[in-house]
Amino acid sequence: MAVRPLSASARVWSSSVSETGKSSQGQDQKHENYQNHQQSSLAGIVIKSALFATVVYGATMFIATKNDKVMDFVIDQQIPYYEETIDLIENGSYDDLVSAIKAKISSIRLPSKDEITELSHKIEHTSEDLLKETKRKLESARAEFGSHSTAGSGTSASLPANQLQKHPEIEHVKKEVEHLPAIKLNENVVSYVDASVKATIDSFNDLINSIDVSKVTPTDEGLIKTINEKVSELASKVGALSKKFDDELQSKLKVSQTELLSSYTKKELELTENLLHQFNRERAQLESKLNERLKQEIAATKETISQAAVNAVSMVRIEQTKNFEKLVADKINEERNGKLANLEKLNSRLESLEQFAESLESQVVATQQKSVIQKSLSSLKAVLFVSNPEEKPQSIKPYVDDLFESSPDDEVIQLALGELGPLLSKESTQSILTTSQLLTRWEQLVPELRSASLLPPNAGLLGHLASIVFSKFLVSVKGDKPDGKDIESVIGRVEASLVRDELDVAVEEVANLKGWTRKLANDWVIEGRKRLEAEYLVELIDAETRIL
């Protein structure tokens, strides 16, 4: 009788056991990595969320201090601690902010990191103990099942000769795996369970799903039931702790809210009092400014009204004056057309008479001015041309100034006086020589001219002595010789001209001399020309006054 080997079923069972062990080890490693990842990701999310919320809160409060719309939104939504934060931004400092945050944080009692870590480790250790206990019981059950299967096969299967003579038969078994019920939490506890606890429960459920129901003994089922109860109890404790933590947090928040409300009310009362005080002060200032401005406007209005009244009265007066003038003009026109019909003729005669009176007045004024000029000119002539050597010399300038003041705005007279003034400004009544005085000086100059005419060129002392001696033998010429070029002829013509009162001819003759004779007669020529210029200018003024 051939014995059917059980090696295939054994191999299937061993492979399932090995797969179960590998899967359990993989599940343990996966569960551990998942817990570490969950812890790190949860801490990172909490920190990032806190930082983001802090930045958004601070930016909103800062913008509210600059924008009225954002401030209205903050007040309407009653954002927590918005008054303290805005007051700190506007009036506070960094130290005040730190102290306020420390005070608020110290008033709230939260579980420490050590407590949370200890709770997480306790849950992890409990889960690991349960997992190890489950593995141990599964391995013992598998060992018992292997011993029972090998005992029935006996000695025939264990003999190597029989096993070599028999060909192994392979049995194809269709494996239908049933799973144990998963661990489920109570609905009242789910909302309070931490994420790490939920992850642990999910890991247990994965482990339970990997176990084949057909290979589980009643002992294993009891163990799984115990694990389920312990996990549910642990989740309930965690939920209770979370609920207790939330209750304590809510109580702390209520206390903080009450304190905040009281501080808010106190701050509101202080701000209201300050605003009322500031409002009263601003109102007093505005009232004083308004009263002062009203006084200024009233004064300006009074001045404007008075000026307008004065202008109106002036306009009325002007209008009445125009009406009166128009009435008088109309009345005069009526009288002119009636009783005063010959008034136009009388008016023309009066105009002609007025023109005659004006011309007569101008002639009288011109005659009077002419007489004044003639009088001043006569005084100047008397001083210039009629000089008494016995009288005391007088300056001629006052006479010239008197003539200048009395002269009209005539261009010729003004030019003549302009030349006469500088000429006679430094002269006196005795400095302008008359014709007789010039003749006397000429006679005194004649001997020197005669001796100078006999000097040779570059004459020395002997030449001067010889000229003096020989000049005594010269015969004087009397009369006028127009064609004579010698010195005696010139002397005769000059004397004849001075006797005839022809000073201009005599001066011209002397001015035409050459050499030493001209140099000796230079002073006489200057005096003669001064006399001639004065006579010419005075005669020019006299002639111009006659034709005025």
Curated annotation (Swiss-Prot):
InterPro entries, alphabetized: MIC60 (IPR019133)
Subcellular location: Mitochondrion inner membrane
Primary gene name: MIC60
Region (Disordered): 14-35
Record note on quaternary structure: Component of the mitochondrial contact site and cristae organizing system (MICOS) complex.
Species per Swiss-Prot/TrEMBL record: Scheffersomyces stipitis (strain ATCC 58785 / CBS 6054 / NBRC 10063 / NRRL Y-11545)
Mitochondrial intermembrane side: 64-548
Protein name listed in UniProt: MICOS complex subunit MIC60
Family: Belongs to the MICOS complex subunit Mic60 family.
TM region positions: 43-63
Pfam families according to UniProt: Mitofilin
